[in-house]
Amino acid sequence: IYAGRPENMNWIKTEMAEVTNLRRQAGTLADVVRGADVFIGVSQPGLLTGDMVRTMHRDAIVFACANPTPEIFPDEARAAGAAVVSTGRSDYPNQINNVLAFPGIFRGAFDVRASDINEPMKLAAAHALSALITPEELCADYIIPKAFDPRVGPAVAAAVAQAARASGVARI
């Protein structure tokens, strides 16, 4: 997407176009991933090919999060040169999925009877997730905790509750 795109836009695409793709690149996906460091996909299965990944910068990062079938499967992305790959699926490393955040976000909000779930609370959840991986553990196949890591829910809930208090939406 890009600002000013005339077709297939909606309000969220319009907002995203304002904060992403600042160079307003247009064309096919193959055109715009050439030379890119990162691909973030949340759209449709099979959209990204190994040939496209090969045109990206060396050691590219590919987040292929369409679910249940990603834009490209991890083995193909890695074979094409991607250094870090994630999907929305639990059967591959680096699952990026809302299942990591939602239970803890709601637990934290309920614990303080938050009147709203606001941006500071969402950011607190993201920071809590990232803090669970130590620098020693961080590697290409472990950039985010696993969904069933028992630390995830409590860490996210505590961070969200604290952010609710700090942002004034906690009622207890």
Where are these regions (language model features)?
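Adenosine-phosphate binding glycine-rich loop
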Residues: 64-172
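Glycine-rich phosphate/diphosphate-binding loop of Rossmann-like nucleotide-binding domains
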Residues: 1-44, 171
